[in-house]
């Protein structure tokens, strides 16, 4: 019998004559966690779709050996029956069903006559959650009553209930808090000890380093290297991923900061479900021409609610004023905001940033169709010219602008959303989690773009949950806590500890602000 549970040998997958995978080899032993690393568009998701039979046997070349025997699965149900289970970045739970019902979906236990055996399902679900160290979870409650971290564990329980021997985790921590991530990594270590193998796909390389035994890197559809994690470090992984050394993830190009161009006055947002509760409480701040303002805070602090209100996209009731060039402007809808010179790249690009049924190019020009309108028709040649320029400027990887945008990787979808907003020629650009789910190479390109836009005089507001990112690219940092402004810092030798201390402080406390706060006379961007 082979030492390997899984062997993928010489995998080739072609789309319209283009090789998305070109001879990739991957091997996984029982109880081993293999980190699958690569930039967006490198082929990671395509490879996992081959393995899980989303692309069935016969639609690709090469061979898959499972326990030393050829695997020629034609459907996901066949691979799951073999013990290969994938947990996607977007959870597949049904919110209104109970935890137990979600765990047994498609594999329900029944009594004679076909009735559901709910007591048996609840007992088994409770056993699974205890194994995952969540003994107090009420598996009879709707899964929607639990947060993202617990829902991720329900997905793992669902996989274990299918007798998973190989667990594929695709960006499993993208919506989790730091503490939830620690729980997840601990559970993966426990599963490894029980002989369950894992393939871990994540752009968060610190997680990859913490949980993986082996690193396999692919680039442009080709296998670059497979190395024991003990012989690797994060800079080496990055070098293999991007094909070049990156001495500094955050660009250090200086840019001048001008006069105040934007002002938010007394922004207050009320909870959608509880209109008496304030999600954002009377926040005011200014923004200068060419300035990059980072907004930091803990999960639930109100950062997304704040910027959504500024752009006119907050779904609940809100109040306050937005001023541009010393004059109040109407930003009560996204269209009015765009016309005023304010645009936003939203946090949830799949639901709010793209139209899935449209092509890449159509998504890029969606916000500026008036620019190409001639009476009752669109000037297709002019539109395509703009699309090609944006694809080139954004280094967007696509075989054709006419392909569905859903055919792109997450990072390239994000570049398309950015291109769409930049075609509006904004004076103020809001970026909400702009690099979430984006690989390290694409992150660097986005940071470079932000610096170039700031150098052109565009004022930028960036919300990010990654403190290193906030400190790496921002000129100034606002800290939000429990819906209120807790700190306003010039980013000069500012530390993550100072930002966290402000986020955890009570707004208005003397200690919640650094002495440098509100000192906005520093017109040169810090260098890192």
Swiss-Prot record:
- Outline the extent of the ABC transporter domain: 6-245, 262-507
How is the protein disposed in the membrane?
Peripheral membrane protein
- Top-level taxon of origin: Bacteria
Q: Single GO cellular component annotation?
A: plasma membrane
InterPro entries reported in the protein's UniProt record: AAA+_ATPase, ABC_carbohydrate_import_ATPase, ABC_transporter-like_ATP-bd, ABC_transporter-like_CS, ABC_transptr_XylG, P-loop_NTPase
Q: Alphabetically list the UniProt keywords.
A: ATP-binding, Cell inner membrane, Cell membrane, Membrane, Nucleotide-binding, Repeat, Sugar transport, Translocase, Transport
Listed under catalytic activity are: D-xylose(out) + ATP + H2O = D-xylose(in) + ADP + phosphate + H(+)
> According to the UniProt record, where is the region Disordered?
504-528
Q: Which residues are noted in the entry as ATP-binding?
A: 38-45
Give the principal location in a single coarse category.
membrane
Q: Which Gene3D superfamilies match?
A: P-loop containing nucleotide triphosphate hydrolases
The similarity annotation says: Belongs to the ABC transporter superfamily. Xylose importer (TC 3.A.1.2.4) family.
> Under what name is this protein listed?
Xylose import ATP-binding protein XylG
Which organism encodes this protein? Pseudomonas syringae pv. tomato (strain ATCC BAA-871 / DC3000)
For this protein's source organism, the top of the classification is: Bacteria, Pseudomonadati, Pseudomonadota, Gammaproteobacteria, Pseudomonadales
């Amino acid at each position: 019998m082979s030492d390997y549970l899984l062997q993928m040998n010489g995998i080739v997958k072609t789309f319209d004559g283009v090789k998305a995978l070109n001879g990739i080899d991957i091997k996984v032993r029982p109880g081993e966690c293999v980190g699958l690393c690569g930039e967006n568009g490198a082929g990671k998701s395509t490879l996992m779709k081959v393995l899980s039979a989303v692309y069935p046997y016969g639609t690709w070349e090469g061979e898959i050996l499972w326990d030393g025997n050829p695997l020629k699965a034609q459907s996901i149900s066949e691979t799951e029956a073999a013990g290969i289970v994938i947990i996607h970045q977007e959870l597949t739970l049904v919110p209104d069903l109970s935890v137990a019902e979600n765990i047994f979906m498609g594999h329900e236990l029944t009594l004679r006559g076909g009735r559901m055996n709910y007591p048996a399902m609840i007992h088994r679900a409770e056993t699974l959650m205890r194994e995952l160290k969540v003994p107090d979870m009420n598996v009879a409650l709707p899964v929607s009553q639990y947060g993202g971290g617990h829902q991720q564990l329900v997905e793992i329980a669902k996989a274990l209930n299918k007798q998973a021997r190989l667990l594929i985790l695709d960006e499993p921590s993208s919506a989790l808090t730091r503490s939830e991530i620690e729980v997840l990594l601990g559970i993966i270590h426990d599963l490894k000890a029980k002989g369950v193998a894992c393939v871990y796909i994540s752009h968060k390389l610190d997680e990859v380093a913490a949980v993986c035994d082996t690193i396999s890197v692919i680039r442009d559809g080709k296998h670059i290297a497979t190395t024991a994690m003990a012989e690797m470090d994060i800079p080496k992984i990055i070098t293999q991923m991007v094909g070049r050394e990156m001495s500094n993830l955050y660009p250090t190009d200086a840019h001048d900061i001008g006069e105040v161009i934007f002002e938010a006055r007394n922004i207050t947002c009320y909870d959608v479900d509880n209109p008496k509760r304030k999600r954002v409480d009377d926040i005011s701040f200014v923004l200068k021409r060419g300035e990059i303002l980072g907004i930091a805070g803990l999960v639930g602090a109100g950062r997304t609610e704040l910027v959504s209100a500024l752009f006119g996209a907050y779904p609940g009731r809100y109040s306050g004023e937005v001023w541009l060039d010393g004059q109040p402007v109407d930003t009560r809808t996204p269209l009015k905001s765009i016309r005023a010179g304010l645009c936003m790249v939203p946090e949830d690009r799949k639901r709010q940033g793209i139209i899935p049924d449209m092509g890449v190019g159509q998504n890029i020009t969606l916000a500026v169709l008036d620019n190409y309108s001639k009476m009752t028709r669109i000037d297709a040649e002019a539109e395509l010219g703009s699309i090609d320029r944006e694809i080139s400027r954004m280094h967007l990887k696509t075989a054709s602008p006419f392909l569905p945008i859903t055919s792109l990787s997450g990072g390239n979808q994000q570049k398309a959303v950015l291109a769409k907003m930049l075609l509006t020629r904004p004076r103020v650009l809001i970026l909400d989690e702009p690099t979430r789910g984006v690989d390290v190479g694409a992150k660097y390109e986005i940071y470079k773009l932000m610096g170039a836009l700031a150098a052109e005089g565009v004022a930028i507001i960036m919300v990010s949950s990654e403190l290193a990112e906030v400190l790496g690219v921002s000129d100034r940092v606002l800290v939000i806590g429990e819906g209120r402004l807790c700190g306003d810092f010039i980013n000069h030798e500012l530390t993550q500890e100072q930002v966290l201390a402000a986020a955890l402080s009570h707004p208005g406390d003397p200690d919640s602000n650094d002495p440098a706060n509100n000192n906005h006379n520093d017109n040169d961007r810090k260098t890192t």
